[in-house]
Amino acid sequence: MKKAGLLFLVMIVIAVVAAGIGYWKLTGEESDTLRKIVLEECLPNQQQNQNPSPCAEVKPNAGYVVLKDLNGPLQYLLMPTYRINGTESPLLTDPSTPNFFWLAWQARDFMSKKYGQPVPDRAVSLAINSRTGRTQNHFHIHISCIRPDVRKQLDNNLANISSRWLPLPGGLRGHEYLARRVTESELVQRSPFMMLAEEVPEAREHMGRYGLAMVRQSDNSFVLLATQRNLLTLNRASAEEIQDHQCEILR
């Protein structure tokens, strides 16, 4: 019993240290890199010179930009043109806020342009990390390839995913996930952030603890995936873990 208690204590210490490291990363100047790129480079360049560089696209009226990420050959980021830190922001559950997940899905075409040929929808995934699972303090959705093993697992669970948030059998990448099936028309009308906040008990009060991802299924529906921070299981709710920025699925 003493050994078990000691092991539990060690796990708690490790979890606290990991959380502390994550917080430290978010308080440094580097955590504002993306925000500076958007607000000090992309947006002014588009407004003054009609040139989105260094972004791939700037849509001031729609409230977003698309930026090629340095990590991986096909990864892009969709970000707002104004200050939103991340999933904890109450703006994301405001109906007047742009539907960033739907906009990010439309921006998947940048992957195909970069690749030189169409990237199948089944190979694409969207993800945003939780407050403790991210390294940047400017809201950004990762548009990238899905890991082949995650793709296979979701295909195998197609029949088990319903229109309600339910635990995904077996989880993903060693972490627990909730899964919810949505149609394209439903996604167009309602943000996944609002679905999570309104349909999962107590989620609205703790949105910053969640990472959220989206993948297209073989029946043309979408599956939303939500994972909640759990320091005891060393889950920082980094939904980006379902992605493979090297795009092995295309080989």
Curated annotation (Swiss-Prot):
GO terms for biological process: CDP-diacylglycerol catabolic process; phospholipid biosynthetic process. Keywords: Cell inner membrane, Cell membrane, Hydrolase, Lipid biosynthesis, Lipid metabolism, Membrane, Phospholipid biosynthesis, Phospholipid metabolism, Transmembrane, Transmembrane helix. One of its GO terms (molecular function) is CDP-diacylglycerol diphosphatase activity. One of its GO terms (cellular component) is plasma membrane. InterPro entries: CDP-diacylglyc_Pase, CDP-diacylglyc_Pase_proteobac, HIT-like_sf. It is an enzyme of class 3 (hydrolase). The keyword Transmembrane helix applies. The keyword Cell membrane applies. Its main location: membrane. Belongs to the Cdh family. This is CDP-diacylglycerol pyrophosphatase. The gene is cdh.
